[in-house]
Amino acid sequence: KTQIADKKHVVDAEGRVLRDNVWGPQIEDAARRDFTINAMYFDPVTQTVVDYHGGLADARGRVLRMIGDPATRYREDPVRILRVVRFAAKLGFGLDKATEAPVRGMVPLLANVPISRLFDEMIKLLQTGHALASLEQMKRFGLVGGGTPIFPVLEAALGGGSAARETFVRLALEDTDRRVAEGRAVAPSFLLACLLWHDVQDRWTAIKAQGEAPFPALQQAVDAVFDARIGDISGRGKLAADMREIWLMQPRFERRTPSGAAGLAAQPRFRAGYDFLRLRADAGEASSALADWWEDYHLGNDEEREALLADVKPASGPQRVKRAAPVASAAPADDGDADEGAETDDDTPPAGEGE
């Protein structure tokens, strides 16, 4: 490629590159790469590696080294800090002293990066198959719990020093790493639903304490958490809808009635909701027996489902409300028929809730 003279290299007052469409020969391209291990080229004619910055030696030594002056490079693009974290976690490489030294002091520069870009980078960090290692690196460099709220989702997930939160998040990230290792897809909506679940629970409890009914309270809690932690990002509508479904299914799993169970199992995102329930059971905040029951119900045939429902003990409190038969009726019904079809299942949420 040849250099285009009318394109400019533009930076802001803090040194962040705003526009950079100037390019040149291969040696200049190599100098613009982030790390030495990313600045190697293979020549298919001579079957040799062209290495301008000692990347091969660093790869063999398992060292992550920034090309150029690290502080300047971080100022040019603060997202390079997140790439340091991602590469170190994914490859298991150590950082050379010059690359590592400025990182903590540069973290506040990430506050100038658009929210949508930070969100995308966070998802990348957690979907490499090394989410737990990435989280440890983020803690190490002050990206989480360091006083600068770069990732509100992670701050909420780990906030308050709650052992229950940390256990649930750790299990969720372990599950994410396992899925990636098995070559299975990891939906961002499921991962985010896990990270923000306890935040939703806290707000749900607070809203119910104000006298709101459970399902409307949960919907309000979901909206509040999403606005506070996710914000205005691309694909917000689909992401919010998927997360909402997963969360709203959780209280419905507790109510196992014939119509309610069949309707829930038929939901398109039932499996995601069930996987979330299983994760909660593994963390000790939901019943393992309940998770087992739903697994059996989901996989069972009609007869097996009927048997499972028959084994369910009635929950405490009012379960069914029977309406009185109409005063004017054409003829008396046989015993047991008057209320046929007139029962309402108190466990079924109002229309539009959780569906």
Where are the regions a protein language model picked out?
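Catalytic cores of the polymerase beta-like nucleotidyltransferase superfamily
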Residues: 1-355
